[in-house]
């Protein structure tokens, strides 16, 4: 298990853009997707390659390809949808599933409302994506469910994380690697990441 805060000037710049309350919906979505690509770049360092032979304009040569058939991307709805385009731009042949979980604003407990996964999900390593890791409840629920379906490896990608959420996920699932664009200070008394960026789902879809 590893918790990796991905350090890069481009990430810092784009995190500033999505934190800014004056950033419009279009720019927010674009920056979110770009940060997602940068995180995935780091998270895919350990992917296995298959040796192949290709023909260049000059000769045949040994080369390597990713085994995309072994990968799946699963966003936690709805905010996780904002990360999908950025992730899929790098691994376009991966399959996509969806898990719908929302947080009860009074109890802060996760509530499940939807799930659709590839039929062969038990043969795939999954990148689970959600912009915000706050209390960790939604992530833990989603990881629990993926493991119950036989998924051999789950890697969690998020944009912002609170220390409390990181601790909760690593305690519940010590085998899951977590890649984070930025670790924030703390949770507020209402369970929001501070200083945060607001409600990621609302900002992705322009609903507030």
Swiss-Prot record:
Its cofactor is Mg(2+). GO terms for biological process: UMP salvage; uracil salvage. It is an enzyme of class 2 (transferase). GO terms for molecular function: GTP binding; magnesium ion binding; uracil phosphoribosyltransferase activity. Keywords: Allosteric enzyme, Glycosyltransferase, GTP-binding, Magnesium, Nucleotide-binding, Transferase. The keyword Nucleotide-binding applies. InterPro entries: PRibTrfase_dom, PRTase-like, Upp_B, UPRTase/APRTase, Ura_phspho_trans. 5-phospho-alpha-D-ribose 1-diphosphate binds at residues 78, 103, 130-138, 199. Binds 1 Mg(2+) ion per subunit. The magnesium is bound as Mg-PRPP. Pathway: Pyrimidine metabolism; UMP biosynthesis via salvage pathway; UMP from uracil: step 1/1. It comes from the Bacteria. Pfam families: UPRTase. Its EC number is 2.4.2.9. SUPFAM superfamilies: PRTase-like. It catalyses: UMP + diphosphate = 5-phospho-alpha-D-ribose 1-diphosphate + uracil. Uracil binds at residues 193, 198-200. Allosterically activated by GTP. CDD domains: PRTases_typeI. The keyword ATP-binding does not apply. Catalyzes the conversion of uracil and 5-phospho-alpha-D-ribose 1-diphosphate (PRPP) to UMP and diphosphate. Belongs to the UPRTase family. HAMAP family: Upp_B (MF_01218_B). This is Uracil phosphoribosyltransferase.
């Amino acid at each position: 298990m590893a918790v990796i805060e991905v350090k890069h000037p481009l990430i810092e710049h784009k995190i500033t853009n999505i934190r800014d309350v004056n950033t419009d919906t279009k720019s927010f979505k674009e920056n979110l997707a770009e940060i997602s690509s940068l995180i995935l770049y780091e998270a895919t360092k350990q992917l296995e390659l298959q040796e192949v032979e290709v023909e260049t304009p000059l000769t045949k040569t040994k080369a390597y390809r990713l085994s995309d058939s072994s990968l799946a991307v699963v966003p936690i709805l709805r905010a996780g949808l904002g990360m999908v385009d950025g992730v899929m731009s790098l691994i376009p042949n991966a399959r996509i599933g969806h898990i719908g979980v929302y947080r009860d604003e009074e109890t802060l407990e996760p509530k499940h409302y939807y799930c659709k996964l590839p039929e062969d999900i038990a043969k795939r390593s999954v990148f689970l994506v959600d912009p915000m890791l706050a209390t960790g409840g939604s992530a833990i629920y989603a990881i629990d469910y993926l493991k119950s379906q036989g998924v051999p490896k789950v890697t969690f990608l998020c944009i912002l994380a609170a220390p409390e959420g990181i601790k909760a996920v690593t305690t519940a699932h010590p085998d899951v690697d977590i890649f984070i664009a930025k670790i924030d200070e703390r949770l507020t008394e209402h369970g929001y990441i501070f200083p945060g960026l607001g409600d990621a789902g609302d900002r992705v879809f322009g609903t507030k």
